[in-house]
């Protein structure tokens, strides 16, 4: 178990009333558990579980499962007024055989001899003090979860099987072998049906996890008989970690053995959920409540895989954004497939701070639907962010700032009184913005020269900005920019109306400004950018573009 404690809960009549009506998905899921025990009354302890396959390093999907489950757990605590104990078990399937050598490990050839051996018996290729591949990856999972302060209990399949904690249920699986086969065989092809067994013996000679047919299953003795790899008939007890279950029966067995009440899993498990449930019931358990989430996709729209190492890692996200933004991305639309790559970070950061600033002004019923209530377990901090992350990225781009001090020069002029000391959240974002810009924006920046119409527009904009005093508000600057665009036929949008009743302004005008002046296709509100960067500085940028010094 980790040293982290569950977040403190302060129950008030307002919170209790709002929770009863809350529509946010963690509350909807928590109500399933209440309904589960509506007739019998709630047990002393409710068990939440998440699973982890340590075939590769943990990725954000792994983290997200724990984060989301923790949100449901917290909502459940509120709905039950914290009168029911809860546990969150993070279970690692580290007795599974290594089916292939992962792509993202050093010296792949050195692991080839260990194919089909339990992951906890495969040597650790990463170096350090960890004895096995699984022990290393399990430690990485716990490190990630500890970083975020989750309260959880880590459980290892290897330890549970070998210590005998699953023995009672495994002996029941031998007794009910025929019932399990009746569930499994219809799900298999004809060829596989002939050799399938829910039991996977671990060869006493080679140490490999064997996919072999059973010659005998002895319910009375609690043993299975099979031919080992060398052809010798072998009998093993199903207890003590000598035998494990195939992954589908294993899922249901674990639920029965641990008494799991709630588990979420990815859409790739959805078609098998009924199988897991039935196996759990055959083994004397009650199937838990489920929540099926959509899978994250990489930049190419492919499913993120632990063994491929595609997508983005937890550490990579945290190099460019605060931890809360990552938790927000996991909270949002869990039933929608979302791309998980570096380009989603700036928008997510700004959304987090937008939700955070709104929280204090909201009534309780709206607070419980605000993601920050769930991210911070009902106690979000106060934070005022006078400059958005997207705006900061444009400021770095225009100013070529390489140090936080340069950016703070612009920020403190724009927002007097704000300093790194009195706004540490903003100071952290300054560092993130510089790093993100250098790694992702700068390499793709591409300025273009303006055509004749665009040159005239830029000259008119320069003149208009020259009429405004230093320190002019961003909204006033934005309106001045719009006035320039409305007078140019190319940028008139007749589907929109200006305040005076004339045509509105096409987004192509702002796209032109960003392409010519910043070297990017889009950006935040241009008036806000000018207010932050400075009117004189923006006019100097326009002059550079007109002189051909940017493209």
From Swiss-Prot:
The gene is lysS. It comes from Brucella melitensis biotype 1 (strain ATCC 23456 / CCUG 17765 / NCTC 10094 / 16M). It is found in: Cytoplasm. This is Lysine--tRNA ligase. NCBIfam families: lysS_arch, PRK00750.1-2. A motif ('KMSKS' region) lies at residues 303-307. Its EC number is 6.1.1.6. A motif ('HIGH' region) lies at residues 54-62. GO terms for cellular component: cytoplasm. GO terms for molecular function: ATP binding; lysine-tRNA ligase activity; tRNA binding. It holds the Pfam family tRNA-synt_1f. Keywords: Aminoacyl-tRNA synthetase, ATP-binding, Cytoplasm, Ligase, Nucleotide-binding, Protein biosynthesis. Belongs to the class-I aminoacyl-tRNA synthetase family. The lineage of its organism: Bacteria, Pseudomonadati, Pseudomonadota, Alphaproteobacteria, Hyphomicrobiales.
């Amino acid at each position: 178990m980790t040293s982290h404690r569950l977040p403190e809960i302060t129950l008030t009549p307002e919170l209790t009333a709002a929770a009863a009506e809350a529509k946010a998905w963690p509350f909807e899921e928590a109500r399933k558990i209440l309904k589960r025990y509506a007739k019998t009354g709630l047990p002393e302890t409710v068990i939440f579980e998440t699973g982890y396959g340590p075939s590769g390093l943990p990725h954000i999907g792994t983290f997200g499962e724990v984060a989301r489950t923790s949100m449901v757990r917290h909502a459940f605590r509120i709905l039950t007024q914290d009168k029911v104990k809860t546990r969150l078990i993070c279970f690692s399937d580290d007795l599974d055989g290594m089916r292939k050598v992962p792509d993202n490990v050093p010296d792949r050839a050195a692991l080839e001899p260990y194919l089909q051996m339990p992951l906890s018996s495969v040597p650790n290729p990463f170096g350090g003090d960890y004895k096995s591949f699984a022990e290393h990856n399990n430690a990485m999972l716990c490190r990630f979860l500890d970083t975020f302060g989750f309260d959880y209990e880590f459980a290892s399949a290897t330890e549970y099987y070998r210590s005998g904690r699953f023995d009672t249920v495994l002996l029941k699986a031998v007794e009910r072998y025929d019932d399990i086969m009746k569930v499994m065989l219809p799900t298999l092809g004809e060829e596989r049906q002939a050799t399938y067994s829910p039991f996977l013996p671990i060869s006493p000679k080679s140490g490999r996890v064997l996919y072999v047919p059973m010659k005998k299953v002895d319910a009375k003795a609690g043993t299975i008989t099979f031919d080992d790899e060398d052809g010798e008939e072998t009998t093993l007890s199903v207890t003590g970690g000598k035998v494990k279950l195939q992954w589908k029966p294993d899922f249901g067995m674990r639920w029965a053995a641990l008494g799991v009440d709630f588990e979420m899993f990815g859409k790739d498990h959805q078609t098998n959920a009924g199988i897991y449930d039935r196996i759990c019931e055959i083994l004397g358990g009650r199937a838990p409540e489920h929540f099926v989430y959509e899978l994250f996709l990489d930049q190419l729209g492919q499913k993120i895989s632990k063994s491929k190492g595609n997508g983005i890692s937890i550490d990579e996200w945290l190099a460019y954004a605060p931890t809360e933004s990552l938790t927000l991305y996991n909270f949002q639309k869990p039933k929608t497939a979302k791309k998980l790559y570096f380009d989603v970070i700036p928008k997510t950061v700004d959304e987090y701070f937008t939700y955070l600033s709104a929280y204090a002004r909201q009534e309780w019923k709206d607070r419980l639907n605000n993601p920050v209530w769930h991210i911070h377990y009902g106690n979000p901090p106060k934070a005022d962010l006078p400059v958005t992350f997207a705006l900061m990225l444009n400021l770095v781009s225009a100013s070529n700032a390489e140090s936080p001090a340069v950016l703070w020069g612009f920020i403190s002029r724009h927002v007097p009184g704000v300093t790194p000391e009195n706004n540490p959240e903003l100071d952290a974002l300054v560092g993130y913005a510089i790093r993100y810009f250098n790694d992702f924006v700068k390499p793709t920046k591409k300025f273009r020269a303006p055509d004749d119409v665009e040159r005239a527009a830029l000259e008119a904009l320069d003149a208009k900005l020259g009429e405004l005093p230093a320190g002019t508000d961003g909204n006033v600057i934005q309106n001045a920019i719009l006035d320039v665009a409305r007078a140019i036929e190319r940028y008139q949008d007749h589907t929109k109306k200006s305040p005076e009743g004339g045509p509105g302004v096409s987004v192509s005008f702002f796209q032109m400004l960003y392409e010519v002046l910043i070297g990017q296709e889009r950006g935040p509100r241009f008036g806000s950018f000018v207010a932050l960067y400075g009117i004189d500085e923006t006019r100097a940028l326009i002059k550079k573009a007109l002189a051909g010094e940017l493209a």
